[in-house]
Amino acid sequence: MAATTGSIPKAQDLAHAIRFEGLSHRLAVNRKDGSVMVYVPAGDFEMGDGKEGDCPKHQVFVSAYWIGVYAVTKGQYLQFMQATKHRAPDNQVHREAGKVVHPVTDISWDDAVAYAKWAGGALPSEAQWEKAARGPAGLIYPWGNDWDASRCRHDKNKGSETTCPVSGYPGGVSGYGTYNQSGNVWEWCADWYGDDYYGKSPARDPRGPEGGSDRVTRGGSWRDDGPEYFRGAYRFGGEPGYRCGYRGFRLVRPASPSIPS
């Protein structure tokens, strides 16, 4: 992965056409698939909420990592399919002109894991996902502590397009520089889902229960309405084999012992 500090990776280094001007964070480009990654430093953050399913609030230490600024796109996933002969998503929208920079959907958890391994990364743990979404200030939403329907893609503003490009809604960028961690598509995480996991999870780099029936999904989507689903702490379980038009994913890569190449 090619690291950049205080500068923007050149467009020709990317495998897809996404606007990312204006980001001032420490960025890198994952060479395998062109994903723009942002560095999240090691440290504690308050995970969870007082609401049912998201409680209790608890301090978690998360080691440093890189996370995708954007969700993986249809164009990127098409490259993966061509390189590996992996099965296509359940729809063929990834082949439509103008859709290559929309998030890939209609993929299972195993599909997302296969892509991540091919790209040299992994799915984020739900702790990694939540820390990035809430930013250094630990906000309720990526942009602040108050719901603002204009800052993310949801049922009331989707129009006829359902998803939007992964660089859409710049007003909803998190404090770490990630786009659309509220709305557009739910995102697969690595962890099994457990309602009571927070009461017994480790305080350092939690990875979820050892087993379960559902995998964690985060973020809310274009088909959801109301502020609840879009909170950074909101957790939901999804059947790993279920493919739908409102679920995608983004990559993470470890920051140590060195930036991957």
Annotate each PLM feature:
Residues 1-29:
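N-terminal pre-domain segments of enzymes
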Residues 6, 26-27, 58-60, 93, ...:
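Hydrophobic alpha-helical segments, principally membrane-spanning helices and signal/leader peptides
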Residues 9, 73, 155-157:
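Generic cytosolic/nucleocytoplasmic N-terminal low-complexity/intrinsically disordered segments
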Residues 11-15, 33-35, 147-149:
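Short small/polar-residue motifs
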Residues 28-89, 106-110, 182-183, 251, ...:
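A short glycine-rich, aromatic-capped structural motif
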Residues 46, 50-51, 87, 92-236, ...:
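Functional-site microenvironments in short loops/helix caps that host divalent-cation chemistry
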